[in-house]
Amino acid sequence: MRFRSLPERTAALRTTWWCAVLALGVALCASGCSTVQTPSPKDPYEGFNRSVYKFNDTVDTAVLKPVATGYKTVVPSPVRTCVSNVFSNVGELWSALNSALQGKGEECANTLMRFALNSTFGFAGCLDIASEIPGLQQRNEDLGQTLGKWGMAPGPYLVLPFFGPSTVRDAAGFSVELVTDPVTNADNVRARNSATALRFVSRRAELLDASRILEGAALDPYSFLRDAYLQRRLNQVYDGEPPDEPPPPNYDDQAPADTPATK
C-alpha cells in the first residue's frame, strides 16, 4: 500500500477542515449562536460550542448511532474486538513517539514492544497478546498530552464538528495527527474511505453504553461531557497525578502587623 506524499496530506487536511467549517456554518445557521449569560472561564465560547454540540448530536442520532447499533448487533463480538484492536495497534507507533517526546523512555520501549508482538504474533494486531505480559499494558499518548507536558496551557474548551470535545491545544495536536495518520493517508481511495468509516463505526459502537448512561443520568449532557473531558485530559497529561488547584484567596484575614491602625 502506498501512502500519500506530504503535500497531498496537507491538501487533504485542508479539505477536511473546510468540510468542518462548512458543517459548523450549517450548525450555526440551524440553531443560531446562543449566548450564555455568565460563561465559564474554561468555556468562554459556550454558546458557540453548544451550537456545534447540537449539530454533532443531530448527526449522531440520525446516522452514526443507528449504524453503530446495527454493527454491534450483526457483527460477532470477537470480530468487533479484532477490528478495534487492529486500529488501536496502528496508533501504537504514534503513541510511542509521543512517549519519547515526553521523556518516557521506558514507556516508549514498551509501546514499541507491544506493536512488534501484536503485529506479528497477534496477526496484525487482531489479538492483543502483549497486554497479557506484565509491563506491556497499553498506554495511550498523543500530541495534545505532549504539548501539555511541555507546559502549553489547554486553552479554551472547543467542540469540533464531527469530532466532539477538544481544546485549542488538543485541536492543534489533532491536526498534526490527521496529517500523519496511516489510515487516512493511504493512497488507495476505496481502502482509505472504507477503513476510515469502519474506524468511526467501531469507535461509536464501543461508546453506545456510555452514551446511554450520559443521556439518562445527566440533566445537562453538554456540561457533563465538557467537565468529564477536561478532567480526563488533565489526568492524562499528569499521568493520573494532576496538581492541586490553589485555594481561593482569603479576604477575611487580618491586616498585616505593620499596617497602621485606623484612628
Predicted regions and their residues:
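Bacterial N-terminal signal peptides that target proteins for export
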Residues: 2-21
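Bacterial Sec-type N-terminal signal peptides, specifically the leucine/valine-rich hydrophobic h-region
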Residues: 29-30
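A structured, mid-to-C-terminal "fold-capping" secondary-structure block
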Residues: 37, 145, 149-263
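Post-signal peptide N-terminal segment of mature Sec-exported envelope proteins
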Residues: 40-71, 88
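Membrane interface segments of multi-pass transport proteins and intramembrane proteases
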Residues: 62, 67-78, 133-135, 144
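Beta-rich strand-turn-strand
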Residues: 84-86
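Mid-length scaffold segments of soluble, non-membrane domains
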Residues: 89-168
